[in-house]
């Protein structure tokens, strides 16, 4: 005799009203567990984030740089090439000679731990607009900061200032403003931001930067290769003119010597080319450096309806879908 083993659903022996309640209870329990898990995950992720993301009209953005050339009066030409793995971590700083908190935050930056073989490039924007005590800034440098980081800054401080000293930007992506710490210390905040690095893979990038000075005419040529990036990326290169150190004993924060001073900015129209221009001279001395950098932007369209829903909301959405499914199943029974 052939016997068949039947799989019997134990809910069949439960009265229908109780079955419905059990199904609904199941949905409620699952929804609760998913929400708790999502909130814990979100909280853990938020705890690791010690910065404010830079806001852009594009979904993702950052700044990378750079290839450096010393503009020494004893030289007439210089060329340097850099591959992606050699690009330094970039820290842009908004500061002023009267800003005492800037001294504290800069000392913290100087104490950061850097892996062997890696490096940091620091660029200091000095306040210029409505400024009477700081001689280092310029209209171009202040405009650059406000255009690039002003919106993020305004939304990140209670005064809604677009250019607040001290401020730090890591890799053109992550803003730290003032001296308020998110973790146990500013050092941990900055170190976490530094360790994160650029959000795009730069290992295949390369850049060549050249300068010649013939009869006082400065000619620059450059080539930036980012072949690994798709056509959804936009690259906007520029040359920064940086003074290594300026002496200003009248500074209100008592520093006297100020380093990494951004003196001028020259926007470039393409990822390769050449240009001749005059740049702002050093405040004092003969210690200017030209640096090739670029802003990158990624236009990331919405990835459908589900992709546009924040994670906790998507959990609720899925749970409601399950509840509707159960309700329809119950109505058919």
Question: Where do the language-model regions lie?
Answer:
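Proline-centered helix-kink/hinge sites
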Residues: 38, 107, 165-166, 312
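Alpha-helical scaffolding within the catalytic cores
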Residues: 76-77, 106-107, 149-154
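Local sequence-structure signature of Cys/Sec-based thiol-disulfide redox active-site neighborhoods
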Residues: 78-128
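Flexible loop/turn segments at secondary-structure boundaries
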Residues: 101, 130-132, 177
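Intrinsically disordered, low-complexity boundary segments flanking structured domains
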Residues: 37-38, 108-113, 191-196
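Secretory targeting signatures
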Residues: 1-55, 89-91, 99, 306-333
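N-terminal "domain-start" segment that seeds a small globular fold
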Residues: 44-81
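Short, conserved sequence motifs used for protein processing/export or organelle targeting and
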Residues: 134-174, 178-308
């Amino acid at each position: 005799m052939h016997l068949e083993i039947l799989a019997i659903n134990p809910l069949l022996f439960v009265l229908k009203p109780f079955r419905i309640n059990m199904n609904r209870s199941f949905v409620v329990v699952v929804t609760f567990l998913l929400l708790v898990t999502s909130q814990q995950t979100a909280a853990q992720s938020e705890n690791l984030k010690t910065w404010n993301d830079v806001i852009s009209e594009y979904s993702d953005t950052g700044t990378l740089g750079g290839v450096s050339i010393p503009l020494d009066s004893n030289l007439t030409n210089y060329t340097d090439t850099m591959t992606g793995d050699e690009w330094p971590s970039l820290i842009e700083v908004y500061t002023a000679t009267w800003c005492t908190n800037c001294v504290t935050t800069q000392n913290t930056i100087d104490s950061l731990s850097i892996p062997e073989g890696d490096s940091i490039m620091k660029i200091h924007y000095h306040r210029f607009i409505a400024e009477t005590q700081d001689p280092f800034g310029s209209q171009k440098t202040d405009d650059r900061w406000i255009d690039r980081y002003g919106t993020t800054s305004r939304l990140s401080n209670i005064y809604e200032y677009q250019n607040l000293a001290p401020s730090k930007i890591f890799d053109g992506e992550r803003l730290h403003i003032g001296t308020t710490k998110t973790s146990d210390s500013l050092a941990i905040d900055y170190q976490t931001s530094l360790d994160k690095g650029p959000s795009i893979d730069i290992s295949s990038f390369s850049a060549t930067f050249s300068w010649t000075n013939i009869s006082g005419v400065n000619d620059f040529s450059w080539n930036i290769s980012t072949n690994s990036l798709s056509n959804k990326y936009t690259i906007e290169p520029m040359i920064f003119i940086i003074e290594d150190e300026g002496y200003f004993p009248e500074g209100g924060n008592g520093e006297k010597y100020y380093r990494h001073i951004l003196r001028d900015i020259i926007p470039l129209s393409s990822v390769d080319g050449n240009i001749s221009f005059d740049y702002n001279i050093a405040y004092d001395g003969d210690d200017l450096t030209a640096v090739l950098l670029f802003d990158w932007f990624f236009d990331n369209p919405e990835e459908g309806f589900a992709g546009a829903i924040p994670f906790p909301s998507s959990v609720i959405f899925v749970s409601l879908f399950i509840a509707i499914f159960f309700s329809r199943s119950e109505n058919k029974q």
